[in-house]
Amino acid sequence: MRFLRRFFQLESSSGILLLIFAMLAMSLANSSLKSHYFNFLDIPIVMQFGTFAIDKSLLHWVNDGLMAIFFVLVGMEVKREMLEGALASYRQAVFPALAAVGGMVVPALIYVLITRSYAELSNGWAIPMATDIAFALGVVALLGARVPLPLKVFLLALAIIDDLGAIVVIALFFSEQLSVPALTIAAFSIFGLLVLNRMKVGHLCGYLLFGGILWASVLKSGVHATLAGVIIGFSIPLKDRRGNRLLHAFEHTLAPWCSFLILPLFAFANAGVSLGSINVASVFSPLPMGIALGLLLGKPLGVFGFCFLAVKLRLAKLPEGVDFKQILAVAVLCGIGFTMSMFLSSLAFGGESTSTINTLSRLGILLGSGLSAVIGYLLLRAFTKPAEN
């Protein structure tokens, strides 16, 4: 028990847990238990209330349900940083914002250039845009006090803006044919959340009620359900009517569940890549190469390039105590797409988890993310000094 308590208190524990669950999924997907693993993910689960029903496989419940809860946390984090954190002013936000834009645009361009001759792969351009903040911060935490605090804050702010970009991409490009009745119910739910926000209600029950209705209606509307999570997160007031820091309290409560349950389960459900049908030629085919190079080369080129230009053009300043070599190391770590890239892959290509296109997409994510983690760690270790006692 003491060991477990100490483990969960480590900064790197969430990243380690993600890696363990991803490796477990890979092991099962390439063992004699392969069919049981994929059949387990395809188990149908039905939620019914009168004539209203949601019939999804376990995999879809993880991707549409549990990840919506994760995006509630994302919404709260973004709101807090915009109100009183690293994004609270133009001067604070401009440097990580430009870095995030570069880190989204360049990987997408590299993917498009590599896959431009294959129309069936065109939907995957957003996959290498993402950064898995839990994994990236987990790698940074392995170096402990060697890493300057301003550099950690820069990475966190960059990743939060990256999440905002992912939210916009999901809303604009991965919504299906829209249902007006479902959107109408969603609008009423949002109104209810706004009323709770304006009244600074401090009880969780109202947010859960309207949030649950919002999630179900958005799921049925054709807009991806994770957007409901973001809206719920933004609806939580910074303080309740008594002055209690409500947003911080909810965020503090939800964060461990996301780090130690939801994201590991997502990794377990999505990282299982069966390598039986994959050969050397397929590894170097356009889809995995477009994703892997987008993450491994596009992310550092975009993040570092935009940072360098921003400083040289005097649009922004380097964080205090941080140099360009350290920015380069963090830029490489931003290539750890992992869970967020897999999530965008599931939206881009859908279909069965065992389909060839999904297998190759996940292979590219694992290659790009894994190499980015190793190279980023080595660079950051080389470019930082041991902390003085």
Swiss-Prot record:
Keyword Ion transport: yes
Family recorded in the similarity comment: Belongs to the NhaA Na(+)/H(+) (TC 2.A.33) antiporter family.
Transmembrane segments: 7-27, 58-78, 94-114, 125-145, 154-174, 176-196, 199-219, 260-280, 291-311, 327-347, 363-383
Membrane topology (UniProt): Multi-pass membrane protein
One Gene Ontology cellular component annotation held by this UniProt entry: plasma membrane
Classification via InterPro entries: Na/H_antiporter_dom_sf, NhaA
Organism of provenance: Actinobacillus succinogenes (strain ATCC 55618 / DSM 22257 / CCUG 43843 / 130Z)
GO molecular function, one term: sodium:proton antiporter activity
Cellular compartments annotated: Cell inner membrane
Protein's recorded name: Na(+)/H(+) antiporter NhaA
PANTHER family: NA(+)_H(+) ANTIPORTER NHAA (PTHR30341:SF0), SODIUM ION/PROTON ANTIPORTER NHAA-RELATED (PTHR30341)
Catalytic activity of the protein: Na(+)(in) + 2 H(+)(out) = Na(+)(out) + 2 H(+)(in)
Keywords: Antiport, Cell inner membrane, Cell membrane, Ion transport, Membrane, Sodium, Sodium transport, Transmembrane, Transmembrane helix, Transport
Pfam families given in the database record: Na_H_antiport_1
Protein function: Na(+)/H(+) antiporter that extrudes sodium in exchange for external protons.
One Gene Ontology biological process: regulation of pH
NCBIfam families referenced in this protein's UniProt entry, alphabetically: NhaA, PRK09560.1, PRK09561.1
